[in-house]
């Protein structure tokens, strides 16, 4: 089955690479229209997935990721239209010039070819990834979580109908609808057909891909994100940022999971934090330095377990740790962070600069929420993933991250001397 999918994707990629920006946008507009026109089919499939997931004991955080509503589906269709408005990087001349030999040389952006994406129970990813791949002239093979099997099948069927109505092969966007995990291992060895693999999931999936894949892999999406509250932070303003970073949508990878509090501000900061977290329904997992003081406040508090510093809660839970200074905070982030998104709240710009320079994450913030790490927020449109590695892309992966380049030499029957 996968062999045939690979062949179809590779053939489709050749046709996609020849499309103009206008032609690609026409396809995307058709997909957006069809997602809305056939929304009832997709929503019914999603309702079945959600019901099964709830019956199987899936957490509320995961159910939130899985669930579609009419408003969310309309938002997904609107996101596709936003991709139409983005500049197409394919064909862009990055640099070039005329050599001494007279050869005119250009370095030009081109599609990667076929992208493979393995992802969790988030049905919006199916459309986001497909739209970005199509915009950049890439075919894509999708392997979503088993919890979204019906939703993904219905969504991809709509996309393929739109492709065919525009004269393009259905092989441009395909989904593996068999939940058998053995197919993941088979997919990891499809280097004959897949040019880049993006796993979006937990540490176990990333480890499997790094160890078994014969395809170049870009990992990311695990977000153990930190906020360090420096001793000079403005408490009221800091709390607004923390509430946003923790509660706006707890199930996302850019949500803060650990709060590091400078010991010199703890006495005034922790009572205010407890009040705010109680109002927001957040459970605090406190270290010994913060536990006693937080227990006198209104927020629910438990003693933090050492392993929780490495957890991506994806829920209304927040670690709180007292640190001695900036060095202590940076050391903690280096030990427990996932190089996703980390922030400092401070009025001391020297400390801010040190934090920016010394915290080796894909996104580092000064006096801002970690929730900004998102393709849409960065002006990149929808994203394929948030890469936490350094090659070939880092941070939110928009259109440019789905391209490579080729060197093009144009001569007049020019020969090398």
UniProtKB/Swiss-Prot annotation:
Cellular-component GO terms for this entry: cytoplasm
GO molecular function: glutamate-5-semialdehyde dehydrogenase activity; NADP binding
KW Cytoplasm (keyword) present: yes
Subcellular location: Cytoplasm
Protein name: Gamma-glutamyl phosphate reductase
Species, as recorded: Escherichia coli O17:K52:H18 (strain UMN026 / ExPEC)
Entry's EC annotation: 1.2.1.41
InterPro entries: Ald_DH/histidinol_DH, Ald_DH_C, Ald_DH_N, Aldehyde_DH_dom, G-glutamylP_reductase_CS, Glu-5-SA_DH, GPR_dom
Cited function: Catalyzes the NADPH-dependent reduction of L-glutamate 5-phosphate into L-glutamate 5-semialdehyde and phosphate. The product spontaneously undergoes cyclization to form 1-pyrroline-5-carboxylate.
Single GO BP term: L-proline biosynthetic process
Keywords: Amino-acid biosynthesis, Cytoplasm, NADP, Oxidoreductase, Proline biosynthesis
Keyword set includes Cytoplasm: yes
Reactions accelerated catalytically: L-glutamate 5-semialdehyde + phosphate + NADP(+) = L-glutamyl 5-phosphate + NADPH + H(+)
Pfam families registered for this protein in UniProt: Aldedh (PF00171)
Biological or metabolic pathway of the protein: Amino-acid biosynthesis; L-proline biosynthesis; L-glutamate 5-semialdehyde from L-glutamate: step 2/2
HAMAP family membership: ProA
Assigned protein family: Belongs to the gamma-glutamyl phosphate reductase family.
């Amino acid at each position: 089955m996968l062999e045939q999918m690979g062949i179809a994707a590779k053939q489709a990629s050749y046709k996609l690479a020849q499309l103009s920006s206008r032609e690609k946008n026409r396809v995307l507009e058709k997909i957006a229209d069809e997602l809305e026109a056939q929304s009832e089919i997709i929503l019914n499939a999603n309702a079945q997935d959600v019901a099964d997931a709830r019956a199987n004991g899936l957490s509320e955080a995961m159910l939130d990721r899985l669930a579609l509503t009419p408003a969310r589906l309309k938002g997904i269709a609107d996101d596709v239209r936003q991709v139409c408005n983005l500049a197409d990087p394919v064909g862009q001349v990055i640099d070039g010039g005329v050599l001494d030999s007279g050869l005119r040389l250009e370095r030009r952006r081109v599609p990667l070819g076929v992208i493979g994406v393995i992802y969790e129970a988030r049905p919006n990813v199916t459309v986001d990834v497909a739209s970005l791949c199509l915009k950049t002239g890439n075919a894509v093979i999708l392997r979503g979580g088993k919890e979204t099997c019906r939703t993904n099948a219905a969504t991809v069927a709509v996309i393929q109908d739109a492709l065919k109505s525009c004269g393009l092969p259905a092989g441009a966007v395909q989904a593996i609808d068999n939940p058998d995990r053995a197919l993941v291992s088979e997919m990891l060895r499809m280097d004959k057909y897949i040019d880049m693999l993006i796993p979006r999931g937990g540490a176990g999936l990333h480890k499997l891909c790094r160890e078994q894949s014969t395809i170049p892999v870009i990992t990311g999406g695990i977000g153990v994100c930190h906020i360090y509250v420096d001793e000079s932070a403005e408490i009221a303003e800091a709390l607004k940022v923390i509430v946003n970073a923790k509660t706006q949508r707890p199930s996302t990878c850019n949500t803060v999971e650990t709060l590091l509090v400078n010991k010199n501000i703890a006495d005034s900061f922790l009572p205010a934090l407890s009040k705010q977290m109680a109002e927001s329904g957040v459970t605090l997992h406190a270290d010994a330095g913060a536990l006693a003081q937080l227990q006198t406040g209104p927020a629910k508090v438990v003693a933090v377990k050492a392993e929780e510093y490495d957890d991506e809660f994806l829920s209304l839970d927040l670690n709180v740790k007292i640190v001695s200074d900036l060095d202590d905070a940076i050391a903690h982030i280096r030990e427990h962070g996932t190089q996703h998104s980390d922030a400092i709240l401070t009025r001391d710009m020297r400390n801010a600069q040190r934090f920016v320079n010394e915290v080796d994450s894909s996104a580092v913030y000064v006096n801002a929420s970690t929730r900004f790490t998102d393709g849409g927020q960065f002006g990149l449109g929808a994203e394929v993933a948030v890469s936490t590695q350094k090659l070939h892309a880092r941070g939110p992966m928009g259109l440019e991250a789905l391209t490579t380049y080729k060197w093009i030499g144009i001569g007049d029957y020019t020969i090398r001397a």
